[in-house]
Amino acid sequence: VYVACSSLCFSRYPLADALHAISELRFHKVDLALHESGSHLKPSDVVADMNRVAQMLRKANVAYAAFHVQIEAPDAEKYRDTLRAVCRLGRVLAVPLVNIPAAPLGADLSEEVTRLTSLTRIAQAEGVILTVETHSQSMTADVAGAAELCRRVPGLGLTLDPSHYMVGSGPCQDYDPLFPFVRHVRLRDTTSNSLQVKVGKGQVEYGRIISQLYRERYQRALSVDIRDTFEPEGPMEPEVRKLKYLLESMV
């Protein structure tokens, strides 16, 4: 198990500066966001010229633990073509895993199983693992729903973002049943009122999460994912460093 850093920690920087900041903090791997509405790389950039994007990412002198992907496409076919290009980029850069969002809350389960089965095959053809993230606004908002998707879609994994099971008026959801499906993890500190708080001010049980992952023989990334869009008042580096050191002391 190793600690990686999300490029979303530094989304206010140009991408080259963000990757440099992550490298300066002595992370060896980056959880790279490719969001169509984001300020860094977009999936459409990859479709337009994959070789140019690959060259640019190689120049940064960091390795990539995962791609965190949000595609905006007019139809299912265009979505598949875009995902295929991103997965191909993953193969070229030896990125093991590509994450996408599951369908929004309230979507039809069998339709989503069909969609994700097709997308998982695309990823597998390029030699990468496809995951969906646990998120309060998607079908994975409910632990049972997330587990059901993974059971019904062969080869699909989960990116565990435990914050989304902690926020809200009800008690924190027990997400232990999901650990067998987890292929990637994103962490920040969280309370029931706020998705992101300063490290040490929240209730995320990092030690328990790590011991559950070890039980499943997990050997992948724990990604520091503190968004600079949440807490604009302070510099990001001290917070990111604090969580990095905390996680490294546990693995």
Q: Which stretches of residues belong to each language-model region?
A:
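Histidine-acidic metal/acid-base catalytic patches
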Residues: 1-7, 12-28, 51-54, 58-61, ...
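A generic secondary-structure micro-motif detector
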Residues: 8, 42-43, 76, 109, ...
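Active-site acidic/histidine proton-transfer and metal-coordination neighborhood
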Residues: 16-17, 56-63, 69-160, 166-167
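Glycine-rich, proline-tolerant flexible connector loops at the mouths of alpha/beta enzymes
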Residues: 31-54, 105-106
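Flexible loop residues that form catalytic
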Residues: 35, 72, 103, 190, ...
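Active-site loop signature of alpha/beta-hydrolase-fold enzymes
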Residues: 35-38, 137, 165, 193
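Metal-dependent catalytic neighborhoods of phosphoester/phosphodiester hydrolases
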Residues: 41-47, 76-80, 110, 233-234
